[in-house]
Amino acid sequence: MSQVTKYNGISKVYFKKILFEIIKIGSLKNINKNILDYGCGEKYLEKMLEKKILNYDIDYRYNEIKDIYKTNFDIVIFNHVLMYLKKDEIKNIFKRFYKKNKNCEFIIGIGKQNFLSIILKNITFNFRAHEGTISSYNDQLQIIKKNMEILKYKKNIFFMTDIFYVKFK
């Protein structure tokens, strides 16, 4: 079982800002749709929304659904998750969601590993942050642009994260 990321201090401020922007870009407070938070961690998004969404994480303690591909979701959120997957795994995940619901929309937060993220890791003593990164920012963006239509985006949240609201082409 893998550990979910724990946020405190300045990293919690950063993370909550990202979630606020995800909620805003998807108008998530004002809709009644079936939402999946893929990589939910400690369910911060659900707490901020103050409404029930389905949560799924590599840490099974947070899972509320066994097979995410058997449920028809309207919106799936990947926040700082795709970077831990190989490019083929990312493509396969999108293919499986496409087979289930061609109208599914996604809100994807992509972290940038840059000078500021290195400073933040050192300030917060979170030296292992992004340790398991497999797919780069450019790898993730390339897959999104090839398979998705970008509906909205918010760039440079604290210069370290871009958020894309997309749907299948």
Please describe what each predicted stretch is.
Residues 1-68, 94:
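Conserved N-terminal segment of class I S-adenosyl-L-methionine
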Residues 113-131:
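Short, glycine-/aromatic-enriched active-site segment of Class I SAM-dependent methyltransferases
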Residues 149-159:
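Conserved S-adenosyl-L-methionine
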